Curated annotation (Swiss-Prot):
Interacts with STAT2 in the cytoplasm. Forms the interferon-stimulated gene factor 3 complex (ISGF3) with the heterodimer STAT1:STAT2; upon stimulation. CDD domains: IRF. Residues 9-116 bind DNA. This is Interferon regulatory factor 9. GO terms for cellular component: nucleus. InterPro entries: Interferon_reg_fac_CS (IPR019817), Interferon_reg_fact_DNA-bd_dom (IPR001346), Interferon_reg_factor-3 (IPR019471), SMAD-like_dom_sf (IPR017855), SMAD_FHA_dom_sf (IPR008984), WH-like_DNA-bd_sf (IPR036388), WH_DNA-bd_sf (IPR036390). One of its GO terms (molecular function) is transcription cis-regulatory region binding. It is found in: Nucleus. Induction: By IFN-alpha and IFN-beta. Upon stimulation the regulatory phosphorylated alpha and beta subunits assemble with the gamma subunit and translocate from the cytoplasm to the nucleus. Belongs to the IRF family. Residues 120-129, 148-157 have a biased composition (Polar residues).
Amino acid sequence: MASGKVRCTRKLRSWIVEQVESGHFPGVCWDDAAKTMFRIPWKHAGKQDFREDQDAAIFKAWALFKEKHKDGDIGHPAVWKTRLRCALNKSSEFEEVPERGRMDVAEPYKVYRILPAGTLPNQPRNQKSPCKRSISCVSPEREENMENGRTNGVVNHSDSGSNIGGGGNGSNRSDSNSNCNSELEEGAGTTEATIREDPVFLEHQLPLNSDYSLLLTFIYGGRVVGKTQVHSLDCRLVAERSDSESSMEQVEFPKPDPLEPTQHLLNQLDRGVLVASNSRGLFVQRLCPIPISWNAPEAPPGPGPHLLPSNKCVELFKTTYFCRDLAQYFQGQGPPPKFQATLHFWEESPGSSHSQENLITVQMEQAFARHLLEKIPEEEKAALFLLQHTEQSPSALGH
């Protein structure tokens, strides 16, 4: 048997051909008679019928070949899969053939084409910086979208809107809205600078179609009385809809009993509360005279209560910080990141020793945050793990 050092200098192409020809790996076989395309089983590691010794065998073999895993070590099939996927997508000798793969069957598989020497894949592969190579390794299925639509991505969300007043006619906005707009514009530079500091992770975690819709939960006296989802970039929380010419969506509080104290408080809601949910995070602006305290990931230190100022835009949740904390959590370096913001409506301004229960509470969150934290696939978690190690060792995924 050749030494490990010799094996590591062999080409990925030769290794792949050898494994397909060997017949040792279930599901790994030629896809055409000319032996120019091959299949790789691609079952999700979280499936109940996942069999590591079969469904992950080829990926584990690649990890052993590259000396990234030793027999007896505790490894993760999703990490092994991501390593081989990265190697295939970085190589100029292979290209995926999506139309021949089947991901909607009991035994899903992908198909890759082995390109003749001297040819190029159908997708032009421009010379990439190390940063962009890392992006394509982490999320190759999104590479085309990111390369063709990068100006509409996370780094420059011109379509997401930074105005809490939304995308309607500016002439319909109040002066207070304009003030909030300018404050958001001032904060945009800081947010985008933070994004640029970690572009790889953000472009991976926040694809172009991320769901920034707003999830609202209304609570009266400690009891949930209603939930709704707002898909527009901004909205106004009101007691009753008005015939305003503004194009901003109006979201009504659930109707309590007319004699309840909650109704008396809602009668004072007046112009309501503006809420914006976009790629930068969650923002609110109090226009009503009701005292409102808030608790959110961006709350200042101290026990509070933290009161919303009148007619001033306040940032409750920042997507960049959430993604940073999410990566640390998946790497075992921190707790699950917080993503919920809470507004408490009071009959009178609460002090530091205020013990009276507030009558109205509104919980809000962005849909994408809960999705990433609770439902992100194991393969994506593995990609985050690999990303950090790739940045520490740029050649870790080479071949």
